[in-house]
Amino acid sequence: FYFMEMNTRLQVEHPVTEMITGHDLVEWQLRVACGESLPVKQQDLAIHGHSIEARIYAENPDKGFLPAIGRLSHFAQPAAVEFIRNAAQDARAEPAAVRIDAGVRAGDAISPHYDPMIAKLIVWGASRDQALARMRAALADTHIVGLSTNVDFLSRLMVNPSFARAQLDTGLIERERAALFPAQSRVPHEVLALAVARVVADESAQAARERDDPWASRHGWRLNTQYMRT
């Protein structure tokens, strides 16, 4: 090779490796950086069960997965733990069923200046079927409001027969387009009315808290034109 790129870092999917081996690779990385040796050898490692990672992105799958920006006005996550057991300490214990690696929370903004990934959602199961079931449940408990995300797309992918059977290749999404990108249904008028009522209530509450702040006024006045809100 005239040139070879070296990525001396952990793989993006390292949580999957951690879940099926029970070892904290980030801790190992820090220890090696401090001059220590790896605590185990390759032949000492064993794989247990199955793990799946879903990367929750601020993007619009229906528009070619274009990145989205905005503020996370609501971000509810499934019940999870930060990490897993250490296999070396208790070989009989199982890894956590659900793990979330996230660097944002409700109120934070996803900007165009950085990667639009919101979180990594990782599950473990004794079998692939169990891992899939746990991922479906975890995605169903993931609720994000404020911008477009790929959560619904990932949920449809998890129930796709080809994906469930691990019949995977780079043409899967295009072949399964009809199932993965169903026609959008119209939002009921009742839902729109409730959304408008919530916005008005939130703005009224904020105006009451900031009544002495002229910059908090949002009445929409415009010079030489009629204000119309849509």
Give the positions of each predicted feature:
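Catalytic cores of soluble metabolic enzymes centered on carboxylation/carboxyl-transfer
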Residues: P15-T230
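Conserved metal-phosphate-binding beta-hairpin within the catalytic cores
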Residues: F1-Q11
